[in-house]
């Protein structure tokens, strides 16, 4: 960078005393003293300096040295003021986004030096020296929100005509940081990604990765495969034991043993030797072992019980122990509490069906579906609320439309709730239907209202699903080997070293100063 003395030498070569008379005689300069126009920081412009210089030359008792010294001092002061203004970040920067030019001040970008536009070394890669501007072949509508981030001091807002995934890519490209991305996701209604916690103990960490992260190693994938097979076997057993042939066989054996006045020990022995019970016991042993190991090595016991997957694991093994306890109690109370115990068992055994949700631990698709439903709770709540209003409205209307019909299925408004629900959801079982003209008109309106009501939140839910699906896909693509990470880091360091020799303009970062 040139210092003030270099600027003086250059100006002496351009404006010397040999051509001073030509400048005075130039018709472009008037003889009248024009008011001095102020440049930046209140200093006179170069045109006014030349005009004042002409007056000094024509004045009496003025010599060349006095004229030049005054001009040089005033022009030097002007350059110093311009340089101070440049250092303070008052200069304007032109940013070209795929042909659309934006103009802002350098100090606006310097508020966030860690970003692409705020770091001189990073943005210099996109500088066009011929046009004196920065060129980015990126999405143009998105840059309104990116530039607003700098102008507002860190507030991120997505333009209405820009898709969510496109704007998220722009935030990543301009390196606005994780805080800006988290703020954007929060504004869009997405759930913040939880921080991944790992045990501090090396031994615990290995077992935690083995049982919690199937993609971490081959052994972890093997454990996940065994877990999936056990879950599938458990679900198959749960379904097959309800088949009539197996159920009747067990009931027949139990009746035969009771008629022969067998002892309690024989009854318990018959229950515990049942093939379904044996297979169920083997599955429960694996589930209990898996749950126990994860609880011992987990990094936070509090977070362990807050995880919905761990709660499902606990709930899925409770029915077995309740069944086992009930069978043991029946040894002493065969007649008294047997009916009550059977009722309790039927209810508790129903909980076993929740084991199917254990598959979501090993299925990315089920995890994405769960995240989508969690992020769309507000829309689902609105859907249920609209359906509730429609059910009340149309069940009341169909009741009063069918009240005079002797063979009507709608004897009361609550009886019409079921009909309104299946009609608004376009299921239409046909067990209840209106017969009068007024009732059919109400049914038609109910079906149309149901279609419109259900269609309203569907685009939002689909958008959320696409967001989580693309995010999961991008995370899988970004998984690279440690050797590639080191190679990329070395290339970045080499690239940064090569950038230091560049003399950046238009908001650049001058690293090489001219020696005085």
Curated annotation (Swiss-Prot):
The activity regulation comment is: The channel activity is up-regulated by cAMP.
Q: Where does the entry say this protein is expressed, by tissue?
A: Detected in brain, cochlear sensory epithelium, cochlear ganglion, tegumentum vasculosum. Detected at low levels in cochlear lagena.
Where exactly are the transmembrane stretches of this chain? 223-244, 276-296, 308-328, 344-363, 380-400, 441-461
Could you mention a single GO BP entry for this protein? potassium ion transmembrane transport
Q: Which reaction does it catalyse?
A: K(+)(in) = K(+)(out)
Q: Name one GO molecular function term.
A: delayed rectifier potassium channel activity
User: Where's it mainly located?
Assistant: membrane
Check the record and name the InterPro entries matching this protein: BTB/POZ_dom, Ion_trans_dom, K_chnl_volt-dep_Kv, K_chnl_volt-dep_Kv1, SKP1/BTB/POZ_sf, T1-type_BTB, VG_K_chnl, Volt_channel_dom_sf
Asked if the record carries the keyword Glycoprotein, the reply is yes
UniProt keyword list: Glycoprotein, Ion channel, Ion transport, Membrane, Potassium, Potassium channel, Potassium transport, Transmembrane, Transmembrane helix, Transport, Voltage-gated channel
The superkingdom of the source organism is Eukaryota
The entry annotates sugar attachment on 261, 339, 503
Question: SMART domains recorded for this chain?
Answer: BTB
Question: Its membrane topology, per UniProt?
Answer: Multi-pass membrane protein
One protein family per Pfam: BTB_2
Any domain commentary?
The N-terminus may be important in determining the rate of inactivation of the channel while the tail may play a role in modulation of channel activity and/or targeting of the channel to specific subcellular compartments.
Q: What does this protein do?
A: Voltage-gated potassium ion channel that mediates K(+) permeability of excitable membranes. When opened in response to the voltage difference across the membrane, KCNA10 channel selectively allows the flow of potassium ions across the membrane down their electrochemical gradient.
Q: Which family does it belong to?
A: Belongs to the potassium channel family. A (Shaker) (TC 1.A.1.2) subfamily. Kv1.8/KCNA10 sub-subfamily.
In terms of PANTHER family, this protein maps to:
POTASSIUM VOLTAGE-GATED CHANNEL SUBFAMILY A MEMBER 10, VOLTAGE-GATED POTASSIUM CHANNEL
Oligomer and partners: Homotetramer.
Protein known as: Potassium voltage-gated channel subfamily A member 10
Annotated organism of origin: Gallus gallus (Chicken)
């Amino acid at each position: 960078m040139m210092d003030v003395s270099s600027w003086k030498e250059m100006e002496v070569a351009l404006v010397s005393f040999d051509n001073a008379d030509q400048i005075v005689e130039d018709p472009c300069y008037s003889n009248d003293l024009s008011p001095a126009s102020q440049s930046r920081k209140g200093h006179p412009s170069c045109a006014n300096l030349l005009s004042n210089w002409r007056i000094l030359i024509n004045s009496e008792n003025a010599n060349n040295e006095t004229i030049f010294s005054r001009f040089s001092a005033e022009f030097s002061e002007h350059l110093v003021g311009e340089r101070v203004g440049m250092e303070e970040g008052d200069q304007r920067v032109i940013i070209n986004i795929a042909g659309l030019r934006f103009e802002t001040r350098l100090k606006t970008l310097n508020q966030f030096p860690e970003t692409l536009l705020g770091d001189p070394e990073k943005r210099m890669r996109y500088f066009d020296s011929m046009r004196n501007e920065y060129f980015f072949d990126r999405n143009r509508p998105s840059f309104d929100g990116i530039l607003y981030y700098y102008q507002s001091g860190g507030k991120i807002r997505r333009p209405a005509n820009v898709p969510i995934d496109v704007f998220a890519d722009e935030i990543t490209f301009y390196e606005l940081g994780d805080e800006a991305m988290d703020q954007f996701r929060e504004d869009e209604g997405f759930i913040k990604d939880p921080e991944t916690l790992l045990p501090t103990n090396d031994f615990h960490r290995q077992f935690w990765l083995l049982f919690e992260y199937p993609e971490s190693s081959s052994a972890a994938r093997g454990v996940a495969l065994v877990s999936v097979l056990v879950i599938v076997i458990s679900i198959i057993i749960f379904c097959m034991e309800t088949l009539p042939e197996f159920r009747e066989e067990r009931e027949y054996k139990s009746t035969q043993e009771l008629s022969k006045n067998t002892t309690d020990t024989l009854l318990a022995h018959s229950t515990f030797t049942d093939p379904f019970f044996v297979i169920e016991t083997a599955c429960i042993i694996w589930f209990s072992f898996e749950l126990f190991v994860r609880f011992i090595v987990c990094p936070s016991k509090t977070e362990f019980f807050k995880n919905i997957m761990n709660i499902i694991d606990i709930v899925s093994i409770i029915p077995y122990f309740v069944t086992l306890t009930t069978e043991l109690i029946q040894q002493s109370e065969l007649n008294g509490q047997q009916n009550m115990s059977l009722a309790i068992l039927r209810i508790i055994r129903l909980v076993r069906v929740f084991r199917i949700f254990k598959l979501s631990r090993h299925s990315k698709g089920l995890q994405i579906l769960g995240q989508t439903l969690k992020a769309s709770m507000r829309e689902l709540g609105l859907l249920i609320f609209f359906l509730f209003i429609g059910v009340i409205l149309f069940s009341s209307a169909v009741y009063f439309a069918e009240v005079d019909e002797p063979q009507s299925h709608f004897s009361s408004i609550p009886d019409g709730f079921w009909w309104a629900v299946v009609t608004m959801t376009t299921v239409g079982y046909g067990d209840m239907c209106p017969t009068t003209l007024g009732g059919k008109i109400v049914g038609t309106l109910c079906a149309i209202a149901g279609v419109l009501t259900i269609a309203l939140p569907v685009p939002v839910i689909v958008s959320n699903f696409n967001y989580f699906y693309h995010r999961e896909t991008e995370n899988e693509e970004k998984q690279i080997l440690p050797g590639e990470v080191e190679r990329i880091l070395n290339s970045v360091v080499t690239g940064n070293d090569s950038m230091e020799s560049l003399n950046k303009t238009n908001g650049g970062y001058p690293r090489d100063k001219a020696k005085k």
